[in-house]
């Protein structure tokens, strides 16, 4: 049985998947999403849809600018010792060294073809 799940996602496309996991009792230990961005008009800071639903569901979330060469996030994920990670249109390439940090690997759900 899964005890710790990492969820990584950013757009609206990822929200129903995160909500379904949460509502069905899956143990989401942490959510990764893109950091808030300034909009073009008025320079208002906008959170990603996954960021917003994570706050609503009271889930721990992290918004690193990049995972590449990010020792803090690497150590955090290593210590978390998660069973699996579910990635839904996260918006970052996940470094190989991070892909090795879960017991059962990463599952990627993507709405379009991935870059080669």
Roles of regions detected by a PLM:
Residues 1-116:
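One-carbon transfer enzymes
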């Amino acid at each position: 049985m899964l005890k710790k799940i990492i969820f990584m996602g950013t757009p609206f496309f990822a929200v129903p998947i995160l909500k379904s996991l949460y509502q069905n009792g899956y143990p989401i230990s942490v959510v990764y999403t893109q950091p808030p961005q300034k909009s073009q008009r008025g320079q208002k800071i906008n959170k990603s849809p996954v960021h917003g639903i994570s706050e609503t569901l009271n889930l721990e979330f992290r918004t690193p600018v990049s995972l590449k060469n990010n020792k803090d996030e690497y150590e955090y994920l290593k210590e978390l010792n998660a069973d699996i990670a579910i990635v839904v249109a996260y918006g970052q390439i996940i470094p190989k060294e991070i892909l090795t940090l879960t017991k059962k690997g990463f599952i990627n759900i993507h709405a379009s073809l991935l870059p080669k």
